[in-house]
Amino acid sequence: MRLWLHLVLLVATLEGVRSQVQLVESGGDVKKPGDSLRLSCKASGYTFSGYTMYWVRQAPGKGLEWVSRIYDDGSDVSYADTVKGRFTISRDNAKNLLYLQMSNLKPEDTGRYYCAR
């Protein structure tokens, strides 16, 4: 299982190097419980509008946790139960941008957030 995960990550990394895919997250900050925050992810090096996009996160000392998903055309979204009703994923295909609006933040939302395709 662990070897498989490392292999998948290696393949994803090599694909990114070959095609110059870049996903750059921004908007992180220190917040208090109950606050709101919007994260952005700028994509380049591929046809953004052709891919379903994801947000995942990693709490300190923990593994990766899936947060949310949005279809290529924005027609369907889904959320982890832990964030449902508080987080909203959206995208702007004209600007190659992915967003995660986070409201009513909780201590357990602490972590590093990543966008992925």
Curated annotation (Swiss-Prot):
Residues 69-85 are annotated as: Complementarity-determining-2. Residues 55-68 are annotated as: Framework-2. One of its GO terms (cellular component) is extracellular region. InterPro entries: Ig-like_dom (IPR007110), Ig-like_dom_sf (IPR036179), Ig-like_fold (IPR013783), Ig_V-set (IPR013106), IgHV (IPR050199). Residues 50-54 are annotated as: Complementarity-determining-1. Residues 1-19 form the signal peptide. It holds the Pfam family V-set. Keywords: Adaptive immunity, Disulfide bond, Immunity, Immunoglobulin, Signal. Residues 86-117 are annotated as: Framework-3. This is Ig heavy chain V region 3. It comes from Carassius auratus. Residues 20-49 are annotated as: Framework-1. SMART domains: IGv. Disulfide bonds join C41-C115. It comes from the Eukaryota. One of its GO terms (biological process) is adaptive immune response.
